[in-house]
């Protein structure tokens, strides 16, 4: 695991750390180049975890959210003396750039933007991301997948689905990759979701379960879409 992910897990990933850290490590090892001296945009940043990840590895980062990133994002930048992060208010449905970034980053964003099964709006977001990337640039992202039917049940009863959060399917993610020249992905997680009994134990079991169950049953999708 990359040193920055291992050292700064709590700053980069704020929930389900074991499984989401594995997804982030996949992006870190499979991206086409290092962050150093790259231009990076994070959308839907909230606490700016992915911006922090890129910045501590030498990128020049624009950390953005619809109403601006949270106070925590700014506090982390100050605490770790990161001068290479700027904070902005940006709407992922209308980004004011063209061919400017080496990487665009996001995590757990798509379902909150559409709040329903609105694939057209998801396509628009990915089209905007494609537009702002330089040729050869990459979108690195981690999202919640719809997963197994028990995941859907638990989310409707206890999680964000009761607020109409949308969880894309594996097929949806293939459709969303269409504007890009190439894509690769990996899926993670089966038992580890939810903040209830034996979470750490369940998350560690996922490493083995993932090898024997279909990827459509997993609940985390990590994608690398290249322009």
Q: What does each of the following model-derived ranges do?
A:
Residues 46:
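Conserved glycine-rich SAM-binding loop
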Residues 136-143:
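Conserved beta-strand signature within the Rossmann-like core of class I S-adenosyl-L-methionine
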Residues 49, 53-83, 88-93:
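Class I SAM-dependent methyltransferase SAM/SAH-binding core
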Residues 184-227:
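A C-terminal cap/extension of S-adenosyl-L-methionine-dependent methyltransferases
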Residues 113-128:
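A short, conserved alpha-helix within the catalytic core of class I
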